[in-house]
Amino acid sequence: MHREPPKKKAEKRLFDASSFGKDLLAGGVAAAVSKTAVAPIERVKLLLQVQASSKQISPEARYKGMVDCLVRIPREQGFFSFWRGNLANVIRYFPTQALNFAFKDKYKQLFMSGVNKEKQFWRWFLANLASGGAAGATSLCVVYPLDFARTRLGVDIGKGPEERQFKGLGDCIMKIAKSDGIAGLYQGFGVSVQGIIVYRASYFGAYDTVKGLLPKPKKTPFLVSFFIAQVVTTCSGILSYPFDTVRRRMMMQSGEAKRQYKGTLDCFVKIYQHEGINSFFRGAFSNVLRGTGGALVLVLYDKIKEFFHIDIGGR
């Protein structure tokens, strides 16, 4: 008779709206700050990834690498074009990262209930991986159209409004939806789910696992947390980068009368056959630098949760 109240209390905690809302706020604020800081590198990375599929960039005008891209963007499009699409990126990234973090902690409660880290280490480790992957996949289903629009806006290289393909976020979504329907906004969704599970599983799972092995995970020094986060984001980014390249290429097809790829597998095969394996990792170094922003998100998220006095369960 006396076991029922604790059970109800546990159920209440599992679906605590207040805690969930604070998770959204903490993750969103941390993400907005970090993405604005690394926006120029983000745009360079996108251009290097998709220039072979862009009709706006002729073969002879393609960027030779990160440095060439960094030099030519301000010269050809203006200095502030480094932040082109950044507002859309912040709008997209707020719900994406916030939902990732919020769902991650909820999935951790579901997957790790009753798991003892000391006695069931591998089950605990796999639960961390599963919670990270499930959080990323769930969030992607909700915000994919915004991610799609962010990509198309980021690789739009016209100098003035008359040369641009899209006027802004709303214009991009409306034009693609009008020409291809809602399905056009989900171009590349399948490979995105595969890539996001690989990335998020290692991103969240490895970070939480390594921090959990420290003597006092809740009192980890900032520099130690940042170093762990930096290593995790770099490894996760490289591991999932080929999936990201293919999904970006698939996104470039929406709204086009003639399509370059028949599907995800065809895209993988054609990139390998016509451009070589290195093309799957084009812009990867920029992504490593951009990963600094991802590392900051992880660390800032923990600090913001501490500020709001949110219990970081399992850490």
From Swiss-Prot:
UniProt subunit comment: Monomer.
Superkingdom: Eukaryota
Family membership noted in the UniProt record: Belongs to the mitochondrial carrier (TC 2.A.29) family.
Keyword Transmembrane helix attributed: yes
Positions annotated to bind ADP: 92, 104, 247
Region (Important for transport activity): 247-252
GO molecular function: ATP:ADP antiporter activity
Domain-related comment: The transmembrane helices are not perpendicular to the plane of the membrane, but cross the membrane at an angle. Odd-numbered transmembrane helices exhibit a sharp kink, due to the presence of a conserved proline residue.
Residues exposed to the Mitochondrial intermembrane side: 1-19, 112-121, 212-222, 302-315
Name the UniProt record assigns to this protein: ADP/ATP translocase 4
GO annotations of cellular component type: membrane; mitochondrial inner membrane; mitochondrial permeability transition pore complex; motile cilium; plasma membrane
Motif Nucleotide carrier signature motif positions after renumbering to this chain: 247-252
Keywords per UniProt: Antiport, Cell membrane, Cell projection, Cilium, Differentiation, Flagellum, Membrane, Mitochondrion, Mitochondrion inner membrane, Repeat, Spermatogenesis, Transmembrane, Transmembrane helix, Transport
TM segment ranges: 20-49, 87-111, 122-142, 191-211, 223-243, 284-301
Compartment(s): Mitochondrion inner membrane; Membrane; Cell projection, Cilium, Flagellum membrane
